[in-house]
């Protein structure tokens, strides 16, 4: 009885240890997905800042144009 219990425990440990090390060393698909999402978000933020500069510049230009045309009239 005691030998079979020791044998079963050693078999269980022998099967669990390689599985745990394989799980720890493998690539995590969720981590890869979040890294890809972060890269895309960073790219889109860069595009957004370019649009902010264009919109603010156009708004200031329109206001200055209105100001100078009203003074010229």
Curated annotation (Swiss-Prot):
In which broad location class does this protein mainly occur, judging by the first location in its UniProt entry?
A: virion
Look up keyword Membrane and say if it applies: yes
Periplasmic compartment residues: 24-47
Q: Which domain of life is it from?
A: Viruses
Q: What protein am I looking at?
A: Capsid protein G8P
Keywords per UniProt: Capsid protein, Helical capsid protein, Host cell inner membrane, Host cell membrane, Host membrane, Membrane, Signal, Transmembrane, Transmembrane helix, Virion
Gene Ontology cellular component list: helical viral capsid; host cell plasma membrane; membrane
Role according to the record:
Self assembles to form a helical capsid wrapping up the viral genomic DNA. The capsid displays a filamentous structure with a length of 760-1950 nm and a width of 6-8 nm. The virion assembly and budding take place at the host inner membrane.
Q: How does it assemble?
A: Homomultimerizes. There are about 2,700 copies of this protein in the phage capsid.
Q: Which InterPro entries match?
A: G8P, Phage_M13_G8P_capsid_dom_sf
Q: Where in the cell is it found?
A: Virion; Host cell inner membrane
Paired cysteines (S-S) = none
A single Pfam family it belongs to is Phage_coatGP8
What high-level taxonomic lineage is stated for the organism? Viruses, Monodnaviria, Loebvirae, Hofneiviricota, Faserviricetes
Q: Give the residue spans that cross the bilayer.
A: 48-68
Classify the protein's membrane topology as the record does: Single-pass type I membrane protein
Look up the signal peptide feature and give its range: 1-23
């Amino acid at each position: 009885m005691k030998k079979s219990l020791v044998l079963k425990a050693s078999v269980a440990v022998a099967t669990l240890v390689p599985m745990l090390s394989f799980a720890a060393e493998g690539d995590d698909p969720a981590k890869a997905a979040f890294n890809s999402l972060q890269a895309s978000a960073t790219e889109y933020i860069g595009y957004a800042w370019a649009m902010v500069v264009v919109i603010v510049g156009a708004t200031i230009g329109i206001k200055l144009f209105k100001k100078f045309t009203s003074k010229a009239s």
